[in-house]
From Swiss-Prot:
Mn(2+) 2 binds at residues 35, 54, 78, 107. Mn(2+) 1 binds at residues 8, 10, 35, 109. InterPro entries: Calcineurin-like_PHP_lpxH, Metallo-depent_PP-like, MPP_YfcE, PdiEstase_YfcE_CS, Phosphodiesterase_MJ0936/Vps29. It is an enzyme of class 3 (hydrolase). The lineage of its organism: Bacteria, Bacillati, Bacillota, Bacilli, Bacillales. GO terms for molecular function: hydrolase activity; metal ion binding. Its EC number is 3.1.4.-. Belongs to the metallophosphoesterase superfamily. YfcE family. Keywords: Hydrolase, Manganese, Metal-binding. This is Probable metallophosphoesterase YsnB. It comes from Bacillus subtilis (strain 168). Binds 2 manganese ions per subunit.
Length: 169
């Protein structure tokens, strides 16, 4: 099962559509972790399951979603309500409450993934305003039995190989 994860697009429309179209045949689910700054029913967001970010004032998005991908549960949140810039423990505890195996969030605009106490945490970075790295990014999560692979891509669809992460869940 493949999941496309994107966040912090801050008003970009064409780019969201281009990325969705590029991967539509290979992914089973598309997630936007907030700060789209678009209306809830905007055509660019149509293929995505979207949560509300701290810059989303125009839509009635939910603060979090609990999605199922195969046998795994994915908590999707922007991260600002959990203070992810200070600690990942708050969002970890929320995932624990909900029984989620994977946590997808944005807010910091910093791409990366790691396992914290058995939960895979993924921040796809930002396709508009990346921080730390200068490359705009999004991610694709591949779930296979007890393994997960997270691959990151730049806006043009080129893999950012040094961010790839393969873990056991």
């Amino acid at each position: 099962m493949n999941v496309l994860i994107i966040s912090d697009s801050h008003g970009l429309e064409e780019e969201l559509q281009t990325i969705a179209k590029r991967h539509e045949a290979e992914v089973d689910l598309m997630i936007h972790c907030g700060d789209s700054e678009l209306e809830t029913r905007h055509p660019a967001l149509e293929p995505y399951a979207v949560v509300k970010g701290n810059c989303d004032f125009a839509g009635d998005f939910k603060d979090e979603l609990l999605l199922t991908a195969g046998s795994r549960k994915i908590l999707v949140t922007h991260g600002h309500l959990h203070g992810i810039k200070q600690t990942l423990l708050n969002v970890y505890y929320r995932a624990e409450e909900l029984g989620a195996d994977v946590i997808c969030f944005g807010h910091s605009h910093i791409a990366g993934s790691e396992v914290l106490r058995g939960k895979l945490m993924i921040n796809p970075g930002s396709i508009r305003l990346p921080r730390v790295r200068r490359t705009e990014s999004y991610a694709i999560l591949t779930l296979e039995n007890d393994a997960a692979t997270v691959r990151f891509y730049d806006q043009a669809g080129n893999e950012i190989e040094d961010l790839q992460n393969r873990v056991t869940l």
